[in-house]
Amino acid sequence: MSYQPQTEAATSRFLNVEEAGKTLRIHFNDCGQGDETVVLLHGSGPGATGWANFSRNIDPLVEAGYRVILLDCPGWGKSDSIVNSGSRSDLNARILKSVVDQLDIAKIHLLGNSMGGHSSVAFTLNWPERVGKLVLMGGGTGGMSLFTPMPTEGIKRLNQLYRQPTIENLKLMMDIFVFDTSDLTDALFEARLNNMLSRRDHLENFVKSLEANPKQFPDFGPRLAEIKAQTLIVWGRNDRFVPMDAGLRLLSGIAGSELHIFRDCGHWAQWEHADAFNQLVLNFLARA
């Protein structure tokens, strides 16, 4: 029987999660039926969703025999919106913990991009016994860069897009989001803009969250040595959102970790170099 590609609509699910005395309706996609589960956590860009972030990576993981969970973090996608005054990554980690508890999944492999990487570190620090392997892409530490003025050019454009969600600002951000912009089609821009504008509450609440606490992503650097999970770090050589030395900091802080740097690659390695990225991750997950 030939493999049937996963679709967003067929795998769409919702669960209610309690957070700070409130009930949040959280959206996720549940793909495949493997014995091992890989959770994919998206970044913080306006209009981001689990599915949009990892659309080029889902089928290879499912075909390899993994169950794949794609979470829409609160404030993104079809999940409820929220104003967050604490650590955004710890919030995402708590939400994920509740979701996998309700799904009765004892242990997960975590694969996170940007904010998703930082949230994966938060989850691992809080519940290390629940984590199999860890893949961190373009995020995970927080803190300052040794070589790049902060906030970076990319983060400045991202914040501008949140405050003024126009097609012009979206193109300005995406122009430095990836290394090769030839794949940035009008259809992609239109889909991303529609995602953003369909949930203006997400955009407004992200800005309110930054105003309540500008440091939504705290520095986990001093605690990286606590991580014992096998860890693969992936970075784009030309990342203009999170500097490459953040990846070196992860490599130095997490014992036994390894770092793969893609050349001609921006902040979206899993999309820009999808085939090579997928093989890299599958080899890592299959390794004893």
From Swiss-Prot:
Q: Which GO molecular function annotations are given, in alphabetical order?
A: 2-hydroxy-6-oxonona-2,4,7-trienedioate hydrolase activity; 2-hydroxy-6-oxonona-2,4-dienedioate hydrolase activity; protein homodimerization activity
Catalytic residue list: 267
In which pathway does this enzyme or protein participate?
A: Aromatic compound metabolism; 3-phenylpropanoate degradation
Q: Where is this site: Catalytic role in ketonization of the dienol substrate (substrate destabilization)?
A: 192
Q: Gene Ontology cellular component?
A: cytoplasm
Q: Identify the EC number(s).
A: 3.7.1.14
Write out the similarity annotation.
Belongs to the AB hydrolase superfamily. MhpC family.
- PANTHER family the UniProt entry points to: ALPHA_BETA-HYDROLASES SUPERFAMILY PROTEIN (PTHR43689:SF8), HYDROLASE (PTHR43689)
| HAMAP family found in the cross-reference section | MhpC
The job of this chain, per UniProt, is described as: Catalyzes the cleavage of the C5-C6 bond of 2-hydroxy-6-oxononadienedioate and 2-hydroxy-6-oxononatrienedioate, a dienol ring fission product of the bacterial meta-cleavage pathway for degradation of phenylpropionic acid.
Protein name stated in the entry? 2-hydroxy-6-oxononadienedioate/2-hydroxy-6-oxononatrienedioate hydrolase
Gene giving rise to this polypeptide = mhpC
